[in-house]
Amino acid sequence: MMRRLAVLSLHTSPLVQPGQGDSGGMNVYVRELVSALAQAGVQADVFTRRWDEASPEVVEVEPGFRVVHVEAGPHDLAKEHLPEVVDAFADGVHKHLEQLGDVDALHANYWLSGVAGHRLKHELDLPLVSTFHTLARVKAETGDPEPERRVRAEAQVIGCSDAILASCGAEADQLERLYGADPGRIELVPPGVDHAFFSPGDRAGARAALRHLRLGDGPVLLFVGRIQPLKGLDVAVRALAALQRPDATLVVVGGASGAEGAEEVARIAALVDDLGLTAQVRMADPQPHHMLSTYYRAADVCVVPSRSESFGLVALEAAACGTPVVAAAVGGLRTLVVDGRTGFLVEGRDPEVFAARVDAILRDDALAAAFGTEAARRGKGYTWSTAAARLRRVYSDLTTRALVDCQ
């Protein structure tokens, strides 16, 4: 029986608001999944690198769920330099785990945590569960290559993990095809959504709550995510131009992220200006997660033009709110968006095609309503309690079998 879990989240904390810096869907994933596990009786400590000297060493989020801040390098260290502090992070986690003494398994999130988890597995003789969230070789296929060091590290962690979590069948296929992962160790555990917040609601009321954005009476397109090239905001902006609807508004919720974030924000601002869309684009700062439901409800269509997406939590949250989604046909978005039933999938990155799909929804109220109803119905099948139940079975199984040897 699983008693206590050590969750590794080196580069980003579940306490940080998603949508800014390196905080995004992974923050939501770790926070919501660990919360659901705690409510199901599995205690968990989430270990993350201290990024703010004012943060206490231990924060109790709720009974059974704590966040432990580990000293590992300068607090303002850029993400590209985090590989240099993995060993210091692992040292700090090791010290805490020796004091706890009753940890049953490690669960690493993202490749950096996986490297630390790989070391700790051997030092502490504990099973290692890995969730990668993004994969270097998948990003390389979209023209966004990562350093070879990351590729090698991911391959090593995949070879040594006792269980590898995939959010959807597409990610499982990528793990097998690109990394030779043992299919017997891949576990399909889709994330969930908090239906207490993300559910259909009154569009007029939502727009009234966002009156500061001056949305007007025309259609509203929504983009939610960190502003970085991977997320494809430029496609959404160009699609707005191609739509040729002066009464349409594109709302962008998110902030600069990663080494290219500031440059991408400037590039998007210049693109908006060049296309003459300044009056039609509204930029909103990253929002507290539960507040995003108001934005989803206010929108006619949510646009998700990512270059790659292991799962696509934004698409799921929009669906749960009954908002049709037009998304790139990549990764987990192929699973979340049922083409022609809950929205549209777009092959390739042609803004004209995105615009045509958005226009089809805007021009047909009956189609939009049908998409929204079916999206909300399907969204109900994704809950964090279900994800936690699946994960508990994975953890329990690991406690009864020998550890996987490194390959």
Regions from the PLM with identified roles:
Residues 1-69, 407:
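N-terminal subdomain of nucleotide-sugar transferases
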Residues 170, 192:
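Carbohydrate-associated surface elements
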Residues 200-215, 220:
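A short helix/loop element that forms part of the nucleotide-sugar donor recognition site in Leloir-type
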Residues 215-231, 237-240, 251:
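Conserved donor-binding/catalytic core segment of Leloir-type glycosyltransferases
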Residues 286, 294-299:
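Short alpha-helical donor nucleotide-sugar binding micro-motif in glycosyltransferases
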Residues 307:
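Aromatic "clamp/platform" in nucleotide-sugar-dependent glycosyltransferases that forms part
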Residues 324-327, 337:
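Short hydrophobic beta-strand element within catalytic cores of glycosyltransferases
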Residues 339-340, 344-351, 360-365:
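Conserved acidic donor-binding segment of nucleotide-sugar-dependent glycosyltransferases
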